Amino acid sequence: MAKIQDDNKLYTCLRPFIDHHLRKSFRRYEVIGQENIPQNAACIFGVNHTNTLMDALVPLSMNSEKKVFIARGDIFKKPLIAKFMHFCRILPIYRIRDGFKSVRDNNTEIIDKAADVIHDNVKLFLFPEASHRTKHSLKQLSKGIFHIALKANEQFGHEKPVYLIPTGIEYGDYFRYRSTALISFGEPINVTEYVNNHKDENEAVIINGLREMLTERMSKLISFIPDNEEDYNAIWEMTKMKSKFRLYEPLAQRLERNQKTIKEILEWKEREPEKAKETFERVDKFTKKRKKKGISIFSVTNENIGGTVFWKTLVALIGLPAYIATVISTLPIWLVTMILKKSFKDKAWGNTISFATETILHPLLMILCIVLAFCNLSWEQATLTSIIYYISYEFFVDATEFLRRWISDVKWCFNKKLRAMSREL
């Protein structure tokens, strides 16, 4: 019987296409810490889970290596979906909430398959939080990833070491298409060595030890605010205000500044809890008013708002004809995207929907554009038209975001009350 990690010609043909469109889904896409991935070892990657299917596509597209993923079992209920997921090299794993029978009947086999994947030197990616959540935090890690690691170590740990690789994905925005994505790989955990050093302990104790280590190391790879932090929203708002946005800085540097700011805020809260509580309440009020007015945090942190409004107004006026042209020419993509997004209650699916509609519709419209252009124009004009249309949707998305921020800047510039509130924070 064919293994999930075996070569598949159709998958191999489609993979570069998917990778290309995934990269187009982000204005910037960066990977750091690849030197932390051990060579000649069995590697299991534990990834934070914040952005639905994008969390799998982002590490998939970082290079052309084979990768297998594990997802929660409830999405495999329909046979057609199960076949598609298998084609995409995604294995199911079942949780107690899926029913004890599902766990008992399926997980032993799945764990064996997962161990076989890493035995064949194929990278295995899991989301140990078990479900996605758009927060800069971590839920308690489920045991599945550790059961796989221990099973693999039991089967072939004497041949090659088994490692858990903490992996963090930091998005510039969970909800806006073509934001930024940073993948970070942290210090690996040598499971084989850990088990050998704790031979006298039972499996439950070993799993708890590994869980603590993986949680700690994953938290160092994201803008981490403790999950039990009741003032999460205020802390994150203050972090964005204090860290400030620098357009072209490396994403790793931006993450480092966020982490430093969060640490300072939490330490200040511990030193002066009463003052912090009062400040957090004022921050929450400010945030609600800011969002109600449609003002972006980028406007709030802009130290030269007047100058920014001036040059953005000029750019908006000059670029308006091109923007209107892309609004019309890419209408099928953004209209379908908008309709589909409205059918999902969970806004976290927004970027996945945007990626899917662009990946399917843009190539079809591109083919139509090429046919019409070369049938009706000179080859020079047709070539230029095709090139322009190829970048038209990216231009449309980025220009729409530019206009949103420009409008936000104008609102912020003329809202004296809110600006006074921000100065008091």
Please give the residue ranges for each predicted region.
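Transmembrane alpha-helical segments and their cytosolic interface motifs
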Residues: F298-T330
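Short, charged, low-complexity loops and linkers
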Residues: D200, M241, T313-L317
